[in-house]
Amino acid sequence: MPLLLHPRFPSSHAAACAHRAAAAHRDARPALRLPELHATRRRRNNVACRATRAREAPPQQQNTAAALSKEAHKYFDHAVVTVRAGDGGHGAVLAMPASPSTDAPKSPRRRSDKGKRSGVKKVSYKRNYDGSVALPMGGHGGDVVVYADEAEETLLRFHEKARYCAKRGGNVGATGTLSSRMHNGFAGETLRIPVPVGTVVKRKKGAVLADLAHPGDEVIVARGGQGGISLIDVPEYRRRKAMVLSPNIMRDVSDRVLIHGQPGEEVSLELILRVVADVGLVGLPNAGKSTLLSAITLARPDIADYPFTTLMPNLGRLGGDPALGALQFSSEATLADLPGLIEGAHLGKGLGRNFLRHLRRTRVIVHVVDAAADDPVDDYKIVREELRMYNPQYLERPYVVVLNKIDLPKAQDRLSSLAFEISSIGCEECDGNNTSEDSLNGNTGEHNTSSETKVEGGEKELRDYPRPQAVVGASVLKHIGIDEMLKEIRAALRKCFDHRLPEP
């Protein structure tokens, strides 16, 4: 007959067998060494605090930073950011101060009390224009302002941080009983965001807010929320008397929503950088534009013998005209070295559309042509045609053609023929009254297809636009013909300046 097991009888034969089997299984397990035992006991969960997680950039952010460093020319002039103004501060629910005439216990008057009461000062509150008590309000939320700063050069930093928030307004400093010492909540600090000079600020897929073309220009892009009001909470039998002091009486529990501040505005902005320059240098890659800029200004752009060395516009300052003498004044001019243009740039090839839009503010255009190339005239026509296809008003501005690299033998032999052939492209009568005021001042639309670009029989061609103001030969590397080139550039600038002067 089998032996029955029962938990109340652990000393039974079956229980003893089970105990021996468990001990044998425990002895069969490999013994842990001392270091492994300590490591097992000290095993902890890795918990990272918020500051540690903030310092460790996520992989997506690291990839963005790598793309910005390698391909900065694709992002330097365009960015989309989100800004949020500060919320308004909260008001408070206040109680009326106790009235000594009604709340104090009655006691027989004495002559000594009469003198003491006469010295008690009455509480005075701030009043509104209608005589009511001015209750404290929550602070106004901080606004968001975008302003033009000369220290900023590109919009690259907005790709690393694309959201900006202003501080909220402060709450009413005290709660409880209404007192004359209460004050409004502190206003939130205005958030000022610097951008490069020449940045166009517009709502994303919306209207243009401002064109920050001059240093110090600014625009409020988001306004902070209004602070909440304060309410007086009094019993119903005292409301009529309290209405004399202030109309802000809490009549119901639902009125508490009035003490909350209003939320600040949140908008998505599109920032577009258009270089502010008086003179724009254009040409095919490796024509010598960067070398020319470094020869006549203090700018030091990257210069190499391979195409597309310049991927972002370089700026330089051209000094005043020394030929005017000490009694006359000539302001400095800003030159912009644009990246090289290729055929089909107006369609976006080689980021041409991004580069061509930086000519919008220029008043004078300088065409830099490699005189030692296989066909310099055809190179000149390619660039002119790209300007015409992108914005026809670019061709109506005064321009100078610089035949560069004349120190080479191939360019010296045909310099005079090249200058004659290029100067003959265009019409003579266009040099006068047909040049629009907007094109001289650098105020052109992005894509102007008005009736001015039409002639009888169709659109204008290159021969229907003005001829160059001058065609000069130079070698900016050998400093040959620099003075003559500067003379013609300053003459073109003077023409634009004289056109803006009002008639006496």
Swiss-Prot record:
User: What are the record keywords, sorted?
Assistant: GTP-binding, Nucleotide-binding
Q: Which InterPro entries match?
A: G_OBG, GTP-bd, GTP1-OBG_CS, GTP1_OBG_dom, GTP1_OBG_dom_sf, OBG_GTPase, P-loop_NTPase, Small_GTP-bd
Q: Which residues bind GTP?
A: 283-290, 337-341
Annotated spans, Disordered:
24-46, 93-122, 436-463
Mind telling me which GO cellular component terms the entry cites?
A: mitochondrion
Q: Which Gene3D superfamilies match?
A: GTP1/OBG domain, P-loop containing nucleotide triphosphate hydrolases
Q: Name one GO molecular function term.
A: GTPase activity
Q: Pfam families in the record, alphabetically?
A: GTP1_OBG, MMR_HSR1
Q: Where is the composition biased (Basic and acidic residues)?
A: 24-39, 453-463
Q: Which residues form the OBG-type G domain?
A: 277-494
Residue ranges annotated as compositionally biased, kind Basic residues, are 107-122
Q: Where is the composition biased (Polar residues)?
A: 436-452
* Role this protein plays: May bind GTP and have GTPase activity.
Similarity remark: Belongs to the TRAFAC class OBG-HflX-like GTPase superfamily. OBG GTPase family.
Q: What is this protein called?
A: Probable GTP-binding protein OBGC2
Natural source organism: Oryza sativa subsp. japonica
